[in-house]
Design a protein with these regions (language model features):
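Hydrophobic core residues within well-ordered beta-strands of beta-rich domains
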Residues: 42, 101-103, 117, 136, ...
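Soluble, non-transmembrane catalytic domains of enzymes that act on hydrophobic metabolites at membranes
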Residues: 43-61, 67, 73, 139-143, ...
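HotDog/MaoC-like acyl-thioester-processing domains
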Residues: 2-25, 113-114, 124-167
């Protein structure tokens, strides 16, 4: 991996995020729009609170629909939250010349959770990007409202150049 680089042109996602930050409830509107594009994420009712190159933070309320049979926050709901944070961070960080897709996830369940959840995805730097596909492992921590680390995930993103647009 190389040192931090300036993104040559912000992604469309990051441009929209930055525009909406000037409005009341801009992050809620943005999060709602993300869930329209990728509906499965709406199952955890996420709110993206931080989105910038190399970092994304997402919060989700402790709702009955996110519980398991024990009455605690479901492990797979935490995975959903982690994947959203990792994907949004990757999208905000990559130059517009490249695309990404998650191809793997490893998860450690560290503690039961019965509160609102907070996922943080961050990387120190991006790999060198060129004409060949590459992998980026995005670490994500999912914590409870009191800061207890409940889930640690590593999500592998396949990054490749965007194909040329047809004329």
């Amino acid at each position: 991996m190389s040192g931090p680089k300036a993104v040559t042109a912000p992604s469309a996602t990051l441009k929209i995020w930055n525009r909406l930050q000037h409005f009341p409830f801009g992050n809620k509107i943005f999060s709602w729009a993300v869930c329209l594009k990728a509906p499965y994420f709406s199952s955890v009712h996420p709110t993206i609170t931080v989105l910038q190159p190399c970092r994304c933070e997402v919060r989700a309320p402790n709702r009955r629909g996110s519980h398991n049979h024990l009455g605690t926050y479901h492990a797979i709901a935490s995975c959903n939250l982690a994947e959203l944070a990792a994907g949004m961070m990757t999208d905000a960080t990559l130059p517009t010349t490249h695309r990404w897709i998650p191809v793997g996830m490893t998860v450690q369940y560290l503690a039961k959770a019965g509160t609102d959840m907070h996922a943080t995805a961050s990387v120190d730097s991006m790999p060198e990007l060129g004409d060949e596909p590459t992998a980026l492992v995005v670490p994500v921590q999912v914590a409870t409202a009191d800061g207890t680390l409940a889930v640690r995930a590593e999500i592998t993103m396949h990054i490749s150049p965007r194909p040329p647009r047809p004329s």
